[in-house]
């Protein structure tokens, strides 16, 4: 049976997962009466909620007697570690672009990697049923993007398909047709079958799966030879050492699941069970004369955060797992399948340093742990600094902002204050397209500020670029915070009197503790307030004169917003039911002593 391996590249929310749904339905993977639901590929609850793909997944369908392995890639640069490896398994890529938005920066990130690996591209312009869409302009924009990424002559000559995933059709022109058959025919026609060279077994491990029943499972493409069940093999590791072991069970992909087989031929993707201690990039080779394939590099982390046990006064109320041993085991387990993540012990026995690719990457991990019933405290995200050629260097990112013209000057002002440099400024209709080069540190907390200052109109995206010399200090949050003076339950009476001081993160009737951040001050500098004072019930006041209290509703903060909001001396308490911000040192006098000590040491 012939094989085609194809990866799908798309920006967040351009309809990649919907396209895969269509392919699965078209090739009758499901029985006609089977309930499937939408978003079949995004199996993780968090992925469905946010509409992003985090872990790459595989599906396989059979069309006209040819087996097509579909590989879904994460679109976000924070999961860059996933993307590169996954593309190694593919022979071609489907580049999916929104007919209105055109190619976006995250797409560019993945496409660049795909073109470097010499994959054959097919461009699919989706959502042509949307009003105001501009498929022809988008086609030209894609061509320019390919050209800017140094595509070869052959790659620039790419086939294009138009259609709507929602309505369920794709065609090689703008005329709607019955279904997505033209696209599937195109895949068979334009994507080359896997290139198989003669020789002994070689298979590179490009991705892994973990099951509590089978342990770690190695996934990759058999690039030559045949692998059989129970066959003795050599595992060639990235440092050149060779381990002799045995492939106990083999699985190939079928529909949405896996099917157990006795042998896998070259060119197909397979999952191997029973190999101990392997890493991404290792080669499974012949037992007698092993030959290694070149290793793959995984993107380095650019950010770190301190994860510790929850040591607030409300500790242990909501969570099932609260000890440092629980947190440690969970983080170590996460590193087995989340490869861009590193965990180290810190000086303190109760906390761990976790390194990741960015705020989104770490935020997803914290959110997942929270839902599993963990309680933890996390500190402010720190950017990793490197020494290059004797200079202190920090990670820089390319920031792309699309914003209505009237706000463009505000955006440029905000970004340049945070040490960003403007490189590109173009007008697209009534929208200004701006591109900046800026330090990753400057991006922390920028999104919330940007949305406030542009009335929610700005669309921003960023991707890691390279390490460059340190840019100096970057201004953080301008305003101070409001801190609870003592533990208790907030009352409408006190919050009403304190409203002119700023806005709150709590409503009346919520429990607070000493040192917890309950709001933002209107001015710079922190202010300790008493939000839980009740009204004196003496007979001196008329009973009805102050019954009506108008309090502005609290501001809701998501986990990522909290991570960007807090400063050096603050942390976030994360439990299954609450996300609270607090000072690291809860007692006000202790905080003052510490601040004094710091200033004398600095002097």
Show where each model-derived region lies.
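P-loop NTPase switch module centered on the Walker A-proximal segment
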Residues: 1-103, 137, 141, 208-211
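Conserved structured catalytic cores and adjacent interaction surfaces
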Residues: 1-18, 77, 100-112, 118-120, ...
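Residue-level signature of catalytic and energy-coupling elements of molecular machines
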Residues: 13, 19, 51, 72, ...
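Interdomain boundary/hinge elements
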Residues: 35-39, 149-161, 194-204, 240-253, ...
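Canonical P-loop GTPase G-domain recognition
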Residues: 120, 130-189
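Conserved nucleotide-binding/hydrolysis modules and their immediate coupling elements
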Residues: 202-305, 315-317, 479, 488-538, ...
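Long insertion/accessory domains within large nucleic-acid-processing enzymes
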Residues: 253, 258-261, 438, 451-567, ...
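A short, contiguous, amphipathic alpha-helix enriched in charged residues
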Residues: 312-335, 548, 552
């Amino acid at each position: 049976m012939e094989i085609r391996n194809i990866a799908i590249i798309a920006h967040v929310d351009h309809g990649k997962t919907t396209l895969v749904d269509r392919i699965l339905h078209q090739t009758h993977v499901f029985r006609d009466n089977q309930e499937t639901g939408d978003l079949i590929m995004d199996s993780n609850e968090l992925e469905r909620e946010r509409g992003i793909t985090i872990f790459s997944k595989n599906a396989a369908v059979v069309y006209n007697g040819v087996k097509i392995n579909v590989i879904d890639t994460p679109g976000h640069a924070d999961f860059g570690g996933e993307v590169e490896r996954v593309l190694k398994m593919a022979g071609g890529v489907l580049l999916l672009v929104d007919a209105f938005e055109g190619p976006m920066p995250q797409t560019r990130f993945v496409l660049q990697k795909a073109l470097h690996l010499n994959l054959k591209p097919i461009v699919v312009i989706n959502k042509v049923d949307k009003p105001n869409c501009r498929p022809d302009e988008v086609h030209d924009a894609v061509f320019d993007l390919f050209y800017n990424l140094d595509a070869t002559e052959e790659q620039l000559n790419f086939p294009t398909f138009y259609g709507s995933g929602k309505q369920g059709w794709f065609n090689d022109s703008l005329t709607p047709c019955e279904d997505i058959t033209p696209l599937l025919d195109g895949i068979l026609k334009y994507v080359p079958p896997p290139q198989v060279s003669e020789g002994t077994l070689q298979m590179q491990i490009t991705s892994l799966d973990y099951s509590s029943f089978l342990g770690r499972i190695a996934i990759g493409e058999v690039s030559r030879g045949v692998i059989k069940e129970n066959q003795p093999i050599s595992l060639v590791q990235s440092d050149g050492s060779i381990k002799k072991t045995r492939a106990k069970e083999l699985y190939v992909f079928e529909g949405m699941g896996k099917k157990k087989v006795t042998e896998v031929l070259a060119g197909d993707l397979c999952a191997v069970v029973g190999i101990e201690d392997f890493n991404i990039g290792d080669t499974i080779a012949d037992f007698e004369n092993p030959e290694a394939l070149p290793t793959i590099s995984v993107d380095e982390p650019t950010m770190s955060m301190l994860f510790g046990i929850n040591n607030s006064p409300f500790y242990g109320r909501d969570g099932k797992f609260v000890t440092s041993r629980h947190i440690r085991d969970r983080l170590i387990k996460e590193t087995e399948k989340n490869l861009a993540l590193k965990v180290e012990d810190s000086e303190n026995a109760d906390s761990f340093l976790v390194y990741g690719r960015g705020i989104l990457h770490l935020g997803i991990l914290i959110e997942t742990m929270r839902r599993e019933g963990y309680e933890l405290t996390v500190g402010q995200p720190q950017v990793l600094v490197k020494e290059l050629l004797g200079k202190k260097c920090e990670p820089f990112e390319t920031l792309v902002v699309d914003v209505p013209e009237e706000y463009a000057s505000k955006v440029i002002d905000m970004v340049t204050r945070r040490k960003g440099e403007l490189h590109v400024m173009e007008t697209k209709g009534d929208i200004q397209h701006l591109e900046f080069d800026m330090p990753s540190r400057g991006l922390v907390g920028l999104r919330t500020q940007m949305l406030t200052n542009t009335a929610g109109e700005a669309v921003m995206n960023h991707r890691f670029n390279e390490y460059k010399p340190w840019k100096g200090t970057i201004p953080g949050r301008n305003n101070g915070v409001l801190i609870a003076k003592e533990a208790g339950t907030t009352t409408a009476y006190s919050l009403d009197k304190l409203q002119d001081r700023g806005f709150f993160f709590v409503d009346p009737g919520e429990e607070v503790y000493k040192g917890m951040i309950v709001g933002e001050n209107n001015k710079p500098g922190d202010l300790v307030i008493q939000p839980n004072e009740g009204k004196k019930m003496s007979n001196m006041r008329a009973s009805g004169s102050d019954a009506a209290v108008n309090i502005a509703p609290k501001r809701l903060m998501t986990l990522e917003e909290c991570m960007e909001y807090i400063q050096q001396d603050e942390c976030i308490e994360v439990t299954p039911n609450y996300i609270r911000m607090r000072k690291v040192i809860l007692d006000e006098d202790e905080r003052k002593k510490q601040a004094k000590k710091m200033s004398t040491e600095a002097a």
